[in-house]
Amino acid sequence: MPHFYAICLTILGYCVLASCGTKSLSTTSLSQIQSDELNTRKASIVEKLKENSQLPVQERIALYHKLKKENSALYDFANETELTLYAYSFLWENNLTDAIPLFELIISEFPTSANAYDSMGEAYLQAKDSLKALQYYGKSLQMNPDNFYAEDVIQKIKFPNLKPLTAQEKFSKIYSQKDYLEDLDQLGKKLLATHPHALKFITKDQFLKNIENKKSLITEKTTYPEFAWHCNAIIASIGCSHSAASTMQNDYHLFSLLPVANSFPLQVRWVNKQLLVVNPMNNSDKVKVKDEILSINGIETANLISDISDHIVAQAHIETHKTQHFNTYFAALIPYALGLPNTFEIVVRGNNSSIKLDKAKEMATELYDPSINSCSKDLCLEILAEKTAVLTISSFNYYEWNNYPIFKSFLDSSMKVIENKKIENLIIDVRYNSGGSQYPSIYLLQHLMDKPFIYYAKAEFEGKTDKIYGEEMVHPLEKRFKGKVYFLIDGNGNSTTGHFMSLVKAHNLGTIIGEELGSNQFCTAGQTLFRLSNTKLVVSSANNTHVSTATTLPDEKGILPDFFVTQSIDDYLNKVDAVKNYALKLIEK
């Protein structure tokens, strides 16, 4: 396995989505039912090995084989990912004595897995055994020609003096027209072959026309970043939030490549169909806060934003998600949409003459809306007056194999406080929650549901051998919250947040306030990475499908609020949380 990020991408294929159902309760207690549910699921063989961590590694492996022979129905022996993470836990500690035998076990158990050989190659590379590293990386590449990481490591071992292009060199790199055209064709074919629902939100005819259109824009002077921008539009056209050109961890990601001097030198915000200055940066002598930009370099703002929107990936092309993305990465998106100009000239309302802006001295990207400041962490509980509490859940990124106990402990303690304080009104804020594991989502629902439910209607991914958590009946907790619930949502809500809120909507668990969520009950997730042959552009494509049981909701829209409330520009500038304030006013009525 190349590195931790790649591991996380693999995990995503196994940890997403949901489904609901009802069943009348018998006289059996809920705690007993939940215990029985746990007993019907296969136990983790890795947890069993961890329980015997005092044993030498060979004895743990012997225990593995013994249990597989004698108790194969009791333990889950099909979870390659969990076993791989277990082996990596030793590799990350540089404990090669344990790591290498465990990777050998994985290869013997999953002989057709290219990833197993890749992981062993990494272990031997860390052990400074280049010959064995080459052997295993070579085998992995042979089994999976798309394993570009193995390809790169092999090159580094064989040619240690070979240096990759710097970000600056890549930014100005020009490939041949033939290389670009071949890569555009490859991109289209790989997306159609890899993505399980590439044509759900676009026809095949239109998808192929988009590729031909981008091919017509290629010239002898097209640079790599301009080509990558074209690729963004092709990928965005399929309407999947889990597919994108390159990754943030890649040195050649478009945002990483862009020199600061080429970035847009104002902090701006797209609000209510207006592009407004919120921070002049080093151009305070030329523009002021709240100036409305009508055009940039002669391009009308509305047309510019429309073009940028076509290059932003979003589930089902949901506009609120695209807007939130723009308001975060405007400093790079504007230059790419304008063809990477050296200078920027703007026209603002009330001034007919153009204003030439000074070059940026720092990147003006803003990751979070400062007006939403109730919680500085992913998880927090705030007790307000009048028997009201705010539970902020800005991430479901808590996985059973890693940090899920943190989420569970937080929610358990928070619900205990809510019970002791006799809270009657609970505001659950899932704004900025881009998703994560189904485990925290289901556990939160168990505190809110008043009847049994199924989380997933569909969970499809390669290598699936059994039902995953959420496909069978889940029961509410005995001590669930029984007061009024209010949910705050925004366009940032993605992936698992869509599943969570779809069930909230379908089961009428409370009042929803905010803007259209950036996702819904339908999600194509997971990640398959591939690299275009000539330009080496890295692309991540979704490779699995997860759908919650809220299947009567439309797939073409995000989860809609009961009350549409958004931040105005004055709310933003004055740090007023209009969405939360609206919820509090509803509670006061």
Mark where each language-model region is:
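Canonical positions in the second alpha-helix
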Residues: 106, 139-140
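C-terminal motif of bacterial Sec signal peptides marking the signal peptidase cleavage site
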Residues: 18-19
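Gly/Ser/Thr-rich loop/hinge elements
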Residues: 435-484, 488, 492, 526-531, ...
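Flexible, low-complexity junctional segments that flank or bridge functional domains
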Residues: 159-425, 432-434, 454-456, 526-531, ...
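Alpha-helical adaptor scaffolds
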Residues: 47-123
